């Protein structure tokens, strides 16, 4: 594509819309990847009365919030709308939006919507209990989080919406549509519907046919970084952008986050430490796990896929521990003018590796086909206050998060034969220097920490720049813009110690799952349909 702007024209900027599970952000970057301003608002999903597990996405309210964020970002940046060279959107995966034949959005659900548990069970029984295997081999997804059971639920319970539905997109595509009036999906996000073929990077309508569902609702597929359209005059009045601003196809939050981290080549590996922790490994060609433990998603880089494992509620568990047990440390940290986690890490640094044998039981390694976890607990506590205290438990939680990540990376290596030589660690967890070092010691790999730790919006801005002709290549731009803060080198002796801790933890966790299986304890989380 011919350049619409030149890099020397430093007055131009890029806008990224980042639609997460709990909030929407509009982030403005300059052409060197520096964040200039942000507008942010929390949003809440709607539980439908008498529909257990439902979490609908409030289309009207959330579009208003998105527009407010765009206006706020422009105001905070102090720049005129005409200097936004392009805009793109990324979002949580799995959340879907349906439109009628006039193009009006009529229904949407967030990624956390779990209403279709019965439909998941029904679908698993299709084709002599082989349907889920067929979905996974083609798309890299199982049924629990896919769009297929949600569409079947609508067919069963909201036939009015199901009959009206003419098109399906993801939430990032909905934002782009509201700006431009153009409907399309990208492979990285649409891949999480369980309806997109990993090899062709296009829909596989036969899967809907096999499920007895309509296959006439599939949107055009366009690659991330493709020019979709321009901001309409109607949208411009609402959001503050200039009519005619290029709108570029975005993508899934994790894949665009990897772009923003420069994780764009085969075998490159990242651990993204947020509320959930994702362990992602770039694969040069589509391959799936014979054991169905790991999901496989299209990367935003054409032709490449990502094996992805997920640790559940890792960041949330740390926040729970801080808020439930560390009121004193929160007060001390406030007086010192530091973050509470920084103080807790300083305390935990005085605890020996292995945390005196304490084993946290929270997230299991990922088992995508039969995905559930044990009841939260700490195992192997002692009543010696010098050895078993807040500092010990905090370090044990950090060590356990690293152990689960290492288990997940090993699962990926088992089927892909990819053994990374280093890790990129990003997200909120990577702010912790002790946690970063523990991850290096547990994994046995050098861990690189980027300057920009929340890289999803940056990756989205890079896509916008490619679509506008500012950048020639997403991969090259991601590599050029990423900057590194520090590297943590593994300690071989600690790595050996953690190998033993990992083996013991896996054995204990299996026993804890047995308590859930016998109905004696309650799972931390269980996938719909189990």
UniProtKB/Swiss-Prot annotation:
Q: Which domain of life is it from?
A: Bacteria
* Substrates-to-products reaction catalysed: (S)-4,5-dihydroxypentane-2,3-dione + ATP = (2S)-2-hydroxy-3,4-dioxopentyl phosphate + ADP + H(+)
- Keyword set, alphabetical order: Cytoplasm, Kinase, Transferase
- Drop me one GO molecular function for this one: autoinducer-2 kinase activity
Compartments where located: Cytoplasm
GO BP, one example?
A: carbohydrate metabolic process
The top EC class, named as a word, is transferase
List the CDD domains hit by this protein, alphabetically. Answer: ASKHA_NBD_FGGY_AI-2K
Mention any one GO cellular component term assigned to this protein in its UniProt record.
Answer: cytoplasm
- A Pfam family in this protein? FGGY_C
E.C. code: 2.7.1.189
Record HAMAP family = LsrK (MF_02053)
Q: What does this protein do?
A: Catalyzes the phosphorylation of autoinducer-2 (AI-2) to phospho-AI-2, which subsequently inactivates the transcriptional regulator LsrR and leads to the transcription of the lsr operon. Phosphorylates the ring-open form of (S)-4,5-dihydroxypentane-2,3-dione (DPD), which is the precursor to all AI-2 signaling molecules, at the C5 position. Required for the regulation of the lsr operon and many other genes.
Family of the protein in this entry: Belongs to the FGGY kinase family.
Q: What is this protein called?
A: Autoinducer-2 kinase
Q: From which source organism is this entry?
A: Escherichia coli (strain K12)
């Amino acid at each position: 594509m011919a350049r619409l702007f030149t890099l020397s024209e430093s007055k131009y900027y890029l806008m990224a819309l980042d639609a997460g599970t709990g909030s929407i952000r509009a982030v403005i970057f300059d052409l060197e990847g520096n964040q200039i301003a942000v507008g942010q608002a929390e949003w809440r999903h709607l539980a439908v009365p008498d529909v257990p597990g439902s979490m609908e996405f409030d289309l009207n309210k959330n579009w208003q919030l998105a527009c407010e964020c765009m206006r706020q970002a422009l105001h905070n940046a102090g720049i005129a709308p005409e200097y936004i060279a392009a805009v793109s959107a990324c979002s949580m995966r799995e959340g879907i939006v349906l439109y009628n034949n006039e193009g009006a959005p009529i229904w949407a659900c967030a990624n956390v919507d779990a209403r279709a548990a019965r439909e998941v069970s029904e679908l698993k029984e299709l084709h002599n209990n082989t349907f889920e295997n067929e979905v996974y081999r083609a798309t890299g997804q199982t049924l629990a989080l896919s769009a297929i059971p949600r569409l079947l639920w609508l067919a069963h319970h909201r036939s009015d919406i199901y009959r009206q539905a003419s098109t399906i997109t993801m939430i990032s595509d909905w934002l782009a549509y509201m700006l431009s009036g153009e409907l399309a999906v990208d492979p990285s996000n649409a891949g999480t519907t369980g309806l997109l073929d990993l090899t062709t990077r296009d829909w596989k309508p036969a899967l809907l046919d096999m499920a007895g569902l309509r296959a006439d609702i599939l949107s055009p597929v366009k690659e991330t970084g493709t020019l979709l359209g321009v901001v309409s005059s109607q949208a411009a009045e609402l959001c503050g952008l200039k009519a005619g601003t290029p709108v570029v196809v975005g993508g899934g939050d994790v894949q665009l986050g990897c772009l923003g981290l420069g994780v764009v080549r085969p075998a490159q590996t990242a651990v993204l430490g947020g509320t959930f922790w994702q362990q992602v490994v770039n694969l040069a060609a589509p391959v799936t796990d014979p054991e169905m433990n790991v999901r496989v998603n299209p990367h935003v880089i054409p032709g490449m896929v990502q094996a992805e494992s997920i640790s559940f509620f890792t960041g949330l568990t740390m926040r729970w521990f801080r808020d439930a047990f560390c009121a004193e440390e929160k007060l001390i940290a406030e007086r010192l003018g530091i973050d509470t986690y920084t103080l807790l890490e300083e305390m935990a640094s005085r605890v020996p590796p292995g945390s005196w044998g304490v084993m946290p039981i929270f997230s299991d390694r990922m088992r995508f086909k039969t995905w559930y976890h044990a009841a939260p607990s700490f195992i192997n506590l002692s009543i010696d206050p010098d050895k078993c205290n807040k500092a010990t438990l905090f370090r044990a939680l950090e060590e356990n998060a690293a152990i689960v990540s290492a288990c997940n990376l090993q699962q990926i290596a088992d089927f892909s034969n990819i053994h990374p030589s280093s890790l990129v660690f990003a997200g909120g967890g990577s702010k912790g220097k002790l946690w970063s070092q523990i991850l290096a010691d547990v994994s046995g790999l050098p861990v690189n920490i980027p300057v920009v730790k929340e890289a999803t919006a940056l990756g989205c801005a890079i896509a916008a720049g490619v679509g506008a002709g500012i950048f020639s290549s997403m991969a090259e731009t991601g590599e050029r813009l990423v900057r590194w803060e520090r590297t943590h080198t593994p300690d071989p002796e600690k790595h050996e110690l953690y190998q033993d801790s990992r083996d013991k933890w896996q054995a204990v966790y299996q026993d804890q799952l047995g308590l859930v299986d016998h109905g004696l304890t309650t799972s931390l989380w269980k996938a719909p349909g189990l």
